[in-house]
Structure formats: C-alpha cells, structure tokens
From Swiss-Prot:
Superkingdom of source: Bacteria
Role of this protein: Catalyzes the hydrolytic deamination of adenine to hypoxanthine. Plays an important role in the purine salvage pathway and in nitrogen catabolism.
Keywords of the record: Hydrolase, Metal-binding, Nucleotide metabolism, Zinc
Example of a GO cellular component annotation carried by this entry: cytosol
Signal sequence range: none
CDD domains per the UniProt record, alphabetical: ADA (cd01320)
Catalysis performed (reactions): adenine + H2O + H(+) = hypoxanthine + NH4(+)
Binding, Zn(2+): 24, 26, 204, 285
GO biological-process terms attached to the record: adenine catabolic process; hypoxanthine salvage; nucleotide metabolic process
Protein name as catalogued: Adenine deaminase
A GO molecular-function descriptor: zinc ion binding
This enzyme's EC code(s): 3.5.4.2
Length: 344
C-alpha cells in the first residue's frame, strides 16, 4: 500500500468497496423528497409543495434556520410504524450501496412525541427497519437517542423516562439541534442519568459553538465521542487533549459546506485533523438535505483536500474503532478493512 494519492476514478471504486461505518447520521435527515411526498399522500397530509420537484427546490437552503424549518416540516409526514421503518430502510439501502457495513443512527424522539406520535411507534418502526437491513443487506446498526438542546432539561428528562422500557435497544444518547446558547452543561444531569442507566454519551460540540463547548463535553459530560468538533482546532491545548485521550470526532464535511461552516471544501480541516493524530471519521449528518451520503462525503473531501489512500484507510478504521461495537467486533471489522486495503 502506497501513500500516494490516486485518480478519482480509482478512488471511487476503492472507497466504495472499503468496509466502513457511519457514526453521525440523523435518520430524520435522510428523508428524501420522493419519500416525503409518498408518505404525505399515504397519510393524507397536505404539504405546501405540489410536486417532488418543489420539495427538492426547498431543500436548496443556505442557512441553519431554513434547514431546520424544512427538516421539521418533513418530519411531520412520519406518522406510523411503517413510515419510520420505510425511512430507516431507505437509508440503509443507500448506505449498503456506498459500502457501509455498520451505522449508529441518531433519532429525535421529541420531534415526534411533541406532535402526538407515541415514543413506542418511533422505536418499533426504526427497529423493524434496522432488523430488516441486517437480514437483507448485511448492514448492522445501533440506535442513539438525541435530546434537542433548544428544549429544556426537564423535557429531556421526560424523554429519558419514556425511553426506559427500551434501554436494551438503545446504544446511547446524544445532544443535537441548535448548539449556540445551549452548551453541554445545560444537559449535564440528564446525560449523567443516561450514563447511570448504562448508555453511552455523545454530543454535538464545536460545530457552530466555541471550543469551550468541546471542553465541557469532555470534562463535564465525559462524552464517549464528539460529534463534529471542527472548532476544537482553534485551541491547541484542546486539540492535544483530544489526541491524548483518543476521542473520536464524527466529522461531516458536506454538511459543514452546506451550512457554511467552511467557505469551500478545499479548506475543510479533515486532513489537518488526521495529520495532527485526531481520531476523525467521515459522516453524512443529514444526507437528504446536505447533498451527499457516506460515499459522496468521502470522495468529495478526498478530492478537495488531497486525502491519500492511507488517510482513507485510516478514516475507515477510525469509524469502527470509534463505534459502540464490542472490542471483539471492532477488531474483526478493522481486520476486514486491512485485508481489503492489502488486496486492493
């Protein structure tokens, strides 16, 4: 295996076949316009769009608030267990086509329970999709419940209470939604309560929020992973700490570009993260809205920042090493990455 960059055509074939995991993907953010339209018709919901093309045009936003508006509007078509199953299965089919072997998907129960959908409906539907994906596609998955940080700590505790009958089916909890003004400290108690129940803890930090939020996430909340983490690079001591502790960063390049976290992909910090020894991974975040699933994120970023073959293999290995699989499963998956790289 050489450390030379390679032609985009060769890299696409190589990266598609490379075993890899996705650790940062919001299932509600994988709702494609076609499925939104189909579910609206199925459930008798009137959308402010006359066609799939009009929905797709609405997906062309340029800021976080416009994205959140269409995101929550889209979630409103998810009503039944079958809807959530279809949503999950559609994502896993795309992941499998991209060479994804494992995913740890986020879901936002408050987005659904606040509009009268039962927590159990969401869980039953998503789990059915996950089970079918494993049986028919060979893709394994885990589920991470996210608390919406623009809502209250009290609301998060209510959601955790609703989740208690489902603990065996949940790998962890996370924090998502509007970051600025809602530091990890706001949810420190509910995240500790979640950890006490045996759940892993992750948090979005350092996407729009300052490095101080990343410090809070690792020192106060004691997260198992940082979701995004780009702005950690502004603080040398924080970067050194993340390297020393080997904390995985679930980086989302095309999301950063779409939401103007970077002005262009060629200045994205992913390559610098790897060069500094950070445990960075590549992920799609909200792929239906941000212009690309897992493979597109790998290929677009590799081309823009000059990732080498070894960089790409490292990213794939990091994705399994940073997962919530067992140590034995991680070792098996990483060995599969190494075997593939050696054979190709």
């Amino acid at each position: 295996m050489t450390d030379a960059s390679f032609a985009p055509s060769a890299s696409a074939e190589f990266v598609r076949g490379l075993p890899k995991a996705e650790l940062h993907m919001h299932i509600e953010g994988s709702l494609e316009p076609e499925l939104m339209f189909e579910l609206a018709q199925r459930n008798g919901i009137t959308l402010p769009f006359a066609s799939v093309e009009e929905i797709r045009a609405a997906y062309d936003f340029s800021n976080l608030q416009d994205f959140l508006d269409i995101y929550y509007q889209g979630a409103g078509v998810l009503i039944t267990e079958a809807d959530f199953k279809d949503l999950a299965l559609a994502y896993f089919q795309r992941l499998a086509a991209d060479g994804g072997a494992h995913a740890e998907i986020f879901f936002d129960p408050q987005t659904h329970t606040d509009r009268g959908i039962a927590f159990d409906t969401v869980m039953n539907g998503l789990l059915a999709g996950m089970d079918e994906a494993e049986k028919t596609l060979g893709v394994t998955s885990k589920l991470i419940l996210c608390f919406l940080r623009h809502l209250s700590e009290e609301a998060a505790f209510e959601t955790l209470e609703q989740a208690k009958p489902w603990l065996a089916k949940l790998a962890g909890v996370g924090l998502d939604s509007s970051e600025v003004g809602h530091p990890p400290a706001k949810f420190a108690r509910v995240l500790q309560a979640s950890r006490d129940l045996g759940l892993k803890v992750v948090a979005h930090a350092g996407e729009e929020g300052p490095p101080a939020y990343v410090w809070e996430a690792i020192d106060l909340v004691k997260v198992d992973r940082i979701d995004h983490g780009n702005r950690a690079l502004e603080d040398e001591a924080l970067t050194a700490r993340l390297v020393k502790d080997g904390i995985t960063l679930t980086v989302c390049p095309l999301s950063n570009l779409k939401l103007c976290g970077v002005p262009s992909l060629d200045v994205h910090p992913l390559k610098r993260m790897l060069d500094l020894g950070l445990k960075a991974t590549v992920n799609s975040d909200d792929p239906a809205y941000f212009g690309g699933y897992l493979l597109e994120n790998y290929l677009a970023t590799a081309d823009a920042v000059g990732l080498t073959r070894d960089d790409i293999v490292t990213l794939a290995k990091n994705s399994f090493a940073g997962s919530f699989l067992t140590d034995a499963e991680k070792a098996q998956r990483i060995a599969a990455v190494e075997a593939y790289a050696a054979a190709h």
